[in-house]
Amino acid sequence: MSNPITITESAQSHFAKLLAQQPEGTNIRVFVVNPGTQNAECGVSYCPPEAVEATDTEYPFSGFSAYVDGLSLPFLEEAVIDFVTDKMGSQLTLKAPNAKMRKVSDDASLMERVEYALQTQVNPQLAGHGGHVRLISISDDGVALVQFGGGCNGCSMVDVTLKEGIEKELLAQFAGELTAVRDSTEHDRGEHSYY
């Protein structure tokens, strides 16, 4: 797999100096908190050997490795870490243009763009309740059919979530393309249900 993160020579040199003062085997971790949301924040931290997870991806650089967790990885596509020096001093910069919302091309199908919005904007909010939603189809007259899962299935709040949250958000984002959002889920209340 190609490396989604560019670390400039000056930043690599800066990290190597910092890591030389850490216990042997310490590398760096690059991550995104709240990936795919407007609250996404990127960060870099030390990563001692015992903090490496089996699901991490390792990217070797000059004198150290950068570890990235699976959830952050797609949102760090095209990220650039640089160490810049100017009249004000020097600082590390991390630019991750896809952290808040990975772009789908503007000419992608309506189905792809709506699915993308559900995955990056709606599902992170539903995840707090153990729920998720997926797009089933879009009719010729612009009605998106969605299916809830996890904690949303059987939840008494699902109608409010659909009408006041998801439908409102999608109709605003896809004005002129979507006319309504409908729920195709057969809601069976159970222990998995949030409410």
UniProtKB/Swiss-Prot annotation:
The keyword Membrane does not apply. It comes from the Bacteria. GO terms for biological process: iron-sulfur cluster assembly; protein maturation. Its cofactor is [4Fe-4S] cluster. It holds the Pfam family NifU. Binds 1 [4Fe-4S] cluster per subunit. The cluster is presumably bound at the interface of two monomers. Keywords: 4Fe-4S, Iron, Iron-sulfur, Metal-binding. InterPro entries: Fe/S_biogenesis_protein_NfuA, FeS_biogenesis, FSCA_dom_sf, HesB-like_dom_sf, NIF_FeS_clus_asmbl_NifU_C. [4Fe-4S] cluster binds at residues 152, 155. SUPFAM superfamilies: Fe-S cluster assembly (FSCA) domain-like, HesB-like domain. One of its GO terms (molecular function) is iron ion binding. Gene3D superfamilies: Fe-S cluster assembly (FSCA), HesB-like domain. Involved in iron-sulfur cluster biogenesis. Binds a 4Fe-4S cluster, can transfer this cluster to apoproteins, and thereby intervenes in the maturation of Fe/S proteins. Could also act as a scaffold/chaperone for damaged Fe/S proteins. Belongs to the NfuA family. Homodimer. PANTHER family: FE_S BIOGENESIS PROTEIN NFUA, IRON-SULFUR CLUSTER SCAFFOLD PROTEIN NFU-RELATED. This is Fe/S biogenesis protein NfuA.
